[in-house]
Design a protein with these regions (language model features):
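Short glycine-dipeptide loop
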Residues: 51, 178-184
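Glycine-rich S-adenosyl-L-methionine
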Residues: 153-178
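Non-catalytic, mostly N-terminal accessory regions of nucleic-acid modification and defense proteins
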Residues: 1-51, 110-123, 217-220, 242-258
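Catalytic-loop motifs flanking and including active-site residues across diverse enzymes
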Residues: 40, 167-170, 229
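Short glycine/serine/proline-enriched coil/turn segments at secondary-structure junctions
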Residues: 194-195, 222-226
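Conserved S-adenosyl-L-methionine
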Residues: 30-134, 139-149, 154-157, 189-191, ...
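Core catalytic lobe of class I
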Residues: 1, 210-211, 218, 228
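Short hydrophobic/aromatic beta-strand or adjacent loop that forms the aromatic wall/cage
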Residues: 228-232, 257
Length: 258
């Protein structure tokens, strides 16, 4: 093991991460679009525990989710070779920031050949990920035209997400990307919990399909983009295998002893 090289990569990576955070703070909303605070990224990684397998972020920004996932693996005596990383980013400049962020740390990743819209030009159409970590743009409006994506296979079994807000488009995209044992952790604005119409029907179907493992409300003022409250969603396609009955009550859990 080349410990000197490892230390140098870590120092350079931390410096890069520091300046990303400073830039996001200075730029405000524009900067926050590519940067998720480290504490939030760390929380998602600790909750879904991406020890080994394929990791995906459909709106990867500057690549912070991937960096923290690799740190999580290495902190549990694993190796970055234990995970395969896939991502996509729409903005060309942010796409370059992500590639640089990962290259500095020696992390191999497939971010697609070019920056592209996840909904209209999926760079990983056949991917089934074991872990998804994401912080989609909050309440993205007019993300598709009224007559666009109506028969998209990603919505199969659900209502078509409304045109006025992309929150449930992101959710269904991520569900479609999960492997049969996949787990997803992602951040959404609190309003995603109470939307009516198609959003309500999609939410109800997710519960009927037993996908929702947890939803946690996070403190305000954690993001540079907004001061609204946000929630962390955990979806788990393997939840049924970790179900027990205790005193007549069904409880769901994930084995955290590994």
């Amino acid at each position: 093991i080349d410990t000197v090289t490892d230390r140098e990569e870590d120092v350079v990576g931390r410096v890069y991460e520091y300046f990303l955070g400073k830039f996001a703070a200075t730029e405000g909303k524009r900067g926050g679009e590519f940067y998720t605070p480290k504490c939030v990224v760390n929380l998602i990684a600790e909750m879904i525990e991406p020890y080994r397998g394929k990791i995906y972020d459909p709106c990867c920004g500057s690549g912070g989710m991937f960096v923290q996932s690799v740190k999580f693996v290495e902190s549990h005596e694993g190796s970055k070779r234990d995970v395969s990383i896939y991502g996509q980013e729409l903005t060309a400049t942010t796409y370059k920031l992500a590639k640089m962020n990962l290259a500095i740390r020696g992390i191999a990743a497939n971010l697609g050949e070019v920056p592209a819209d996840t909904f209209f030009k999926d760079q990983h159409p056949d991917l089934k990920a074991d872990f998804i970590l994401a912080n989609p743009p909050f309440n993205l409006k007019e993300w598709r035209g009224t007559d666009e994506l109506l028969d998209d296979p990603r919505w199969a079994g659900y209502e078509v997400p409304p045109t006025g807000n992309a929150n449930y488009g992101w959710i269904l995209h991520m569900i479609s990307k999960l492997s049969e044992n996949g787990v997803a952790g992602f951040i959404l604005a609190n309003g995603a919990l109470s939307g009516g119409g198609e959003e309500y029907k999609i939410r109800r179907k997710m519960i009927e399909n037993d996908l929702v493992e947890a939803i946690m409300v996070l403190p305000r003022d954690m993001f540079y983009t907004t001061d609204i409250s946000v929630t962390l969603w955990i979806l788990n396609k393997n939840k049924k295998e970790h179900t027990v009955k205790l005193n007549g009550v069904t409880k769901h859990y994930r084995d955290r002893t590994g």
